[in-house]
Amino acid sequence: SSSCTVYGQPDELPVTEKAPIKKAESPYGNTKQINEEIIRDTVASGAPINAIMLRYFNPIGAHPTALLGELPNGVPQNLIPYLTQTAIGIREKLSVFGDDYDTPDGSCIRDFINVVDLAKAHVIAIRRILEKKQKEKVEVFNIGTGRGVSVLELINGFEKATGVKLNYQIVGRRAGDIEKVWANPDFANKELGWKAVETLEDTCLLYTSPSPRD
């Protein structure tokens, strides 16, 4: 379980697996870079293992039953839980960190990947290792949709999908935030036979659905 944070702020978008690993912008990104180095070194040392590193972009969503999902204790650190807690009144307002980035609406751009699609990528990766189908001892795949969505676009999409008007405010930039990043998932599409299929609209709607999906 790696992360797109290993790329830092990519020079080219969408970012591919061949993009250089730049200095991490956050402690979290640094830990992912260190973890990747440890895995590569372990395999290179002759250990009898192979590895697949899945570089997640921004996971969101819940299982369709609504029985398994993201329900953090305390103040959420991720956008979607904070957004949903604001929608149902747990939080007074949502803070958008910065509207002066070099993006169409000034807010950060991310690649939001549904957690169910992400879980399916894990199953495929594990089977690839067990069935000895790897082409290299260490393989890396971007797990994203290939679609960049800004924070303000996500808020607007949530409001449209749910009919809930969100109370949000623009505040200053947050240290460690990447301006914009989204995946080129072509390698995972081709090699793993995997592709993100869940839409952002359906993902947002599930958060406030009164009953689980079948």
Language-model regions: role of each:
Residues 61-62, 84-102, 110-139:
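Alpha-helical substrate-binding/gating segment
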Residues 140, 171-195:
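Conserved C-terminal active-site "lid" loop/helix of NAD(P)H-dependent oxidoreductases
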Residues 5-58, 67-78:
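Catalytic helix-loop patch of NAD(P)-dependent Rossmann-fold dehydrogenases
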Residues 26, 74, 78, 110-116, ...:
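Residue-level signal for the nucleotide or nucleotide-sugar donor/cofactor binding architecture
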Residues 2:
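Conserved NAD(P)H cofactor-binding loop of Rossmann-fold oxidoreductase domains
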Residues 207-214:
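Conserved small/polar residues in nucleotide/adenosyl-binding loops
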Residues 51, 94, 166-168:
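Generic structural signal for residues in well-ordered beta-strands
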Residues 83, 121-173:
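Mid/C-terminal beta-alpha module of Rossmann-like enzyme folds, strongest
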